[in-house]
Amino acid sequence: MSLPERPGAKASYEQRNSYRKSPSRRNRPNDIEASGYYPVTGGQHQRGPSVNSFAETIRSPNSNIESAPLSPSAEQIEHGSDQPFQRKRSLIRPERNRIDRDHPNYHYRKHAAKMNTLPSSTGNDPVLEDVSGATESGPPSGSNSASGSGVREENIPRKSRKASGRETVAEKSDNTRRRVSTRNSKIVKEGKRKEKIPEQLRPPSAWNVYCAVITFWSPDFIMKCCGMPAKAQRRAWREKIGLISLILIIMGVVGFLTFGFNQAVCGGPVLRLHINSVDRSYMIFHGTAYNLDGSHHPVAEGIPKRLDGTGANVVYDLPEGYGGTDGSFMFQNVNGKCKGLITKAPNSDVPSEGDNLAWYFPCHARNQDGSSQPNMTYPYYFGYACHTTPLARSTFYTQLDKSADVYFTWADIRNNSRNLFVYSGNVLDLDLLFWFNRDQVNIPRRFEELRDKNNAANRAIRGRDATRTFMASGDRQIAECFEDIIKVGTVDTDTVGCIAAKVVLYVSLALILSVVGARFTLALIFQWFISKNYAADKTSQTSDKRKRNKQIEDWSEDIYRAPPRMPGDVGSSVAGASSSDHTSKRSSFLPTTSRFSTVYGAERSARNKSMPTTMASQASGGYMGPSSTAYRETNESRTSFLKSDPYATNTAPIEGPGPSGFIHDSVVPQPPSDWMPFGFPLAHTICLVTAYSEGELGLRTTLDSVAMTDYPNSHKVILVICDGIIKGKGESKSTPEYVLDMMKDHTIPVEDVEAFSYVAVASGSKRHNMAKIYAGFYDYGTQSNIPLDKQQRVPMMVVVKCGTPDEMVKSKPGNRGKRDSQIILMSFLQKVMFDERMTELEYEMFNGLWKVTGISPDFYEIVLMVDADTKVFPDSLTHMISAMVKDPEIMGLCGETKIANKRDSWVSAIQVFEYFISHHLAKSFESVFGGVTCLPGCFCMYRIKAPKGAQNYWVPILANPDVVEHYSENVVDTLHKKNLLLLGEDRYLTTLMLRTFPKRKQVFVPQAVCKTTVPDSFMVLLSQRRRWINSTIHNLMELVLVRDLCGTFCFSMQFVIFIELIGTLVLPAAIAFTFYVVIISIINQPPQIIPLVLLGLILGLPAILIIITAHSWSYVLWMLIYLLSLPVWNFVLPAYAFWKFDDFSWGDTRKTAGEKTKKAGIEYEGEFDSSKITMKRWAEFERDRRARQSQYWGSRENVTGGVRTASGVWASAPPHHHQQQYDEYYSDA
C-alpha cells in the first residue's frame, strides 16, 4: 500500500545517498530538470492526524496541504532568502505549471503530496530536499526500520517528544476528542450553508440561457401542468430540447453540404449550348444564344406582315432561314474599344459622326460553324439589316432575354478548320477579320498579321489562350477590340462557385474514403499482425487457431453450454505443467544455481531478454505469501502501512496476530515469482462480478466460468458485489442469498457477519450505506456439471450492500447502482495504495482478502470486470492478463462478446453482425492507436497500477484519485452528467481513463471471448439502445475535448472521435439521404455516381472484412439481415433515443419482483449524516482491534506483540490464542 515503491524495494533514496545531507555535499541549484516539483519542507508533505469520522475528514483532510500550494508562486520563491535564482516562467515545462481543478492529474497531485516521497513526472528517483535544513530524529518514512505492528510512529500513543527543536504530533486528550465530535455537525451544516451562497449568486451559463431561449414558448407553469413539477425535470426537458435543436442544426448543415451547397455557390443549372448544336429556334449574337421562337419583327422591307397583323418571325417565316445562325453583324458593337483603331476610309459611304462609325462589317448573318464566306453586298439598300436606329438598339438590349451561353471546348478551339483563339475566357474568331470592306473602313496592319494563318503571329495564338501574350506585348487594346467585334462564344469552364463546390465535394469524398479505408486497412493490420502479440503463448485450449475459433462459435451457440476443454484435461497445453515451466530456459546437466543465488529463484542474466514487470516478479525478494518463512523477512511493497513501527528491525520480525485474525488454513499457496506457466510473469488479479437481480442459474454459470479459467488460483480472487438485497422476477430467493449459497469455508460464520458503513455514490441520506463482507472459497455445489477432480479452489469474497437499518423496511435496501459497486472496489484500491483513511467496510475488505489469499491487497495489479450474466471462455483471462503484462502501457482492454441467443427472434438476429462489426472493425481500428473509446462493462479489464520509471516505482491507474473522484461524482445536476453517470457509467469509466491518461493504451484482445444474452424483444432493445446511444453521444462529447490523444489535425484520434460524434448525431438524416439518393438515381438519368460509389464502399467493406476475418461463413447471412434492418439501427433507435434524452430510467432491461420499471437518477431526500461513518488508516484500525482484543489501550506490549527486556531490547510476546495456526503465514502487520 505504497506509492511509489514496489515490493523488493531497496533502501530509501535518502538512505542510499546519505551524503545528500552531509555538510560536505555541494548545494546545487533547484533546476527544473531535476525534479517535478519545487522543493518544499518535509513538514509540508506529512500526513495530517487521522480523524474518526467522515465529517472531520471532509472538513479538513490535511490542513498543511490545503494551505501550501504544490507549486509555489514566483512571489513566494522570490522572498526566500536562501533560494537560488529561478528560471523564467516561459521555460517551465507544462507538467510543472500550477495544477488547477481542471487539470487531469489534480487529485492525484493532492493525494501524492501527502506521501513522504513526491511523485516524479520524469521517471527519475524523486529528490527530497529539506529547504529549511531542519531534520527529524528517527529513520525516514518508507525505510526498512518499521516493525510489524502496523502502527505509524505518529499514531502510537505516547508522550510528546522533541526532534530538532520541533514538537511532534502528540495524542489528543479524551476531552478534546469529545469536543471535536460535538462540533462536527455544526461545522458540516455551516459549510453546506456557505456552499449554497455562491450557487445562488452564480450567473446562468450560456448553455442554460440558450436552452431557456429555445424553449421560451413553454413556461414553467405549463410544464408543471404537464407532469413536470420538479425543477430538475423541467431543466432536463429544456436541455433536451436544446440538444435536439443542435442536432437538427447539424443535420441541416450536413444536408446543405450534401444537396444545397452546390446549388448555393454554383447557382441554378445555367443553360449552356455547345457550338454547332444550337437549334433553329435560336439566333447567336456575340457568343450568346437568344430564343426567338415566339418573337415578331416589325414590318420592314423583306419582312412581310402576317395575317394576324404582326410582323414575321425571323427564324421561321423568312425564306433566308435565320434560325441557328450567328447574327452578330446585325447588331455590331461599334465605337467602343475599337474607336481609333478602325477608322473611316476615304470616300467611304458608312455614316459617321466624327470618329464614330455606324458599322464596321456588312450586316449579314453567318453560319455558326464558320463556313460562311465574306459577303460585301446589301440586298435592298446600303446598310440594310444593320439596325442602327435607337429603337432597334433599345429593343435588342432591353427587351430580348439571353437564353444561353454558347461554349467551345478546347477541341473545338484547336480545330484546324477554324481560326480561333481565347482571350480572357472568350473565344474570338480571326476569320471574321476578312469581312472588313477595305473600301469602307481602314484597319491596323496588326489585324492583317493576326488573321493570316501563314503568319508567325497567327500561329503563336491560334488554338491557344493568348491572354498573357496580348498582355505582355502591348496589344491589350487590340484584344479588347476583338472582344467587341469578333467574339463567337466562351470557353467551356465552370464558375468560381462551381469550382469551389467541386473542390468541397471531392475533398469531402477523399476525406470520407480515407477514413473508411484507413479504418478497414488498419483493422486488418491489427487482426493479422498486432493482436497476436497480446495473446498468451500457451493456454488450456488448443493452439490451432482455426479449431479454437470453431470451438468458440459452437460454445457461443448456447448460454449454458460448457467449454470444449477444461484446464487440466488431456491435450491441454498447460496440463500437468512441471517445474520446467518456472523458466523458459532449456534443461541442462550443468548447475543453474550456486551459493550466491537467491533463495527465491534463479537470477536472470543481463544477456537474457528482460521480462515484463509485475508486483511479484520485479524483485525476487518480494513478499509472496505464506509458502515459506523466507518470504517473511521484509515487506518492501507495503512500507507505508504494514511496516510502520520505527522501532522494529529487519533481522527480528515481530510475530503477532494477523490482519484481524488468522490467514485461512486452506489458502492457495503462492508459487515462486519466476513460475511462468503461460510464458509471462503472473500478475495478481481481482475478478469483479457485479450482481443485481440475477437468478441462481445465471449466477452459477457465470461464477463457474470465472472460477474455471485456466489462470492460476494463487493469482486470482473472485469478488462479487451484490447491489442491494434484490429478488429477481420469478425467483424464490434474493440474489445475495444465491451468491452466499455458492460459498464455503467462510472465515467468519455467515450469521456472525456484521454490516459496516461506507460512503455511497448517492445524494441525501442515501449517501450513507452499509454492507457486509463474506470471505471464503467458491463452492461448485453438489449438482455441478464440473467433475470433482476438475473443481479448483478459488478464493472468493462477497460484498452485500444491505443498507442502513432505516432501509430494511423499504424496497431494494442497499441498492445504489452499479457505479457505486465499482467505486467500492476502486476507492478501496486507492486507499490501499496511498495508505489513506478508509472506512470500516474497506478495512474489513482488506482483512478478508488477506485471509483467503494470504497476500496483501497491495499486490493486486489488475481488475477483471464481468457482469453476472456473462460467461467467460476458459483461456480468456489468461490472454487478457498476458496483454497487460507484456505491455505496461496498456491500462485497459476488452475481449469479444458473442451472442448466445442468436436465433431466439428477429430482434436478436439483427444484433449478431452489429456486435461482430463493432469489435472487429471499430475496436480493432482504435486498438492500433491504443484508443478504444468503449470498453464494455460486461467484459473488460483495467490496470490498478503500473510500473513507472526507475526500479520500485508504481503509478496508480484505476486507483488514480482523479479517476476515482470523477467517477464517484454524486452531484449529478445536468443532463450531460446524468447521461454520463446514470446511463453509461461503464463507457464513462473508459472516457475517464483516456482523459486522465491520454498517452496510455486501451486495446481490444480478440483472443479473449465471452458470451451473453441480448434482448429478444423490440421494446427491451429500444430501451437498451436508448441508454447506449445517449451515453455514446455524451461520452464522445467528453473525448473530443481531449487534445492529447495520438495524432494531429485530421490524422488524429481526436478527429476520428469528432467524425464518429457527428456521424452518430446525423444517423437519422443519413439514412434518409441514402434512400433519397438511391430513389433519385433510379428515377433520373444519369444517376449520381459519387454517392452511390461511396454508399457501396461503406456497405461493402464490412462484407470483405467478414470474408477475411470471420470465423464462420454464417456471418454473411447475419450481415444481410443487418443490412435489411438498417432503418431500425439508423433511424428508429437514434430518433427514439434523441427524444428520450431526459429519460434516465433503465427501462425493462432487468425486472425485479414487484417492480414495473427501474429508475435511475432519483433525487434522494434527507440529509447525509457523515458522523456515522468512521474513517481511519488501516494501522489505526488494526491498533484498535488489538487493543480491544487485549483489553488494554496504549500498551506497547499489546500493540506490537512484544515486551521490552531489561537490556532495552524488544522481544516477542507470548503467543496469542491462534498463534500456532497463523504463525507460518503471517509476516508483519
Curated annotation (Swiss-Prot):
Transmembrane domains' residue ranges: 203-223, 241-261, 496-516, 1055-1075, 1089-1109, 1115-1135
Region of interest: Disordered: 1-196, 539-589, 601-648, 1210-1229
CDD domains: Chitin_synth_C
Assigned GO CC terms: cell septum; cellular bud neck; chitosome; incipient cellular bud site; plasma membrane; prospore membrane
Enzyme class (EC, first level): transferase
Glycosylation sites: N608, N635, N1030
Presence of keyword Metal-binding: no
Biased composition (Low complexity): 137-150, 568-581
Location relative to the cell: Cell membrane
Presence of keyword Manganese: no
Record key words, sorted: Cell membrane, Cell wall biogenesis/degradation, Glycoprotein, Glycosyltransferase, Membrane, Transferase, Transmembrane, Transmembrane helix
Basic residues bias locations: 18-27
Documented EC number(s): 2.4.1.16
UniProt GO molecular function: chitin synthase activity
Membrane topology, Cytoplasmic segments: 1-202, 262-495, 1076-1088, 1136-1229
Topology of the protein relative to the lipid bilayer: Multi-pass membrane protein
GO biological process: ascospore wall assembly; chitin biosynthetic process; protein localization to bud neck
InterPro entries reported in the protein's UniProt record: Chitin_synth, CHS4-like_dom, Cyt_B5-like_heme/steroid-bd, Nucleotide-diphossugar_trans
PANTHER family: CHITIN SYNTHASE, CHITIN SYNTHASE 3
Family affiliation: Belongs to the chitin synthase family. Class IV subfamily.
Name of the protein this chain belongs to: Chitin synthase 4
Organism: Pyricularia oryzae (strain 70-15 / ATCC MYA-4617 / FGSC 8958) (Rice blast fungus)
Gene (name only): CHS4
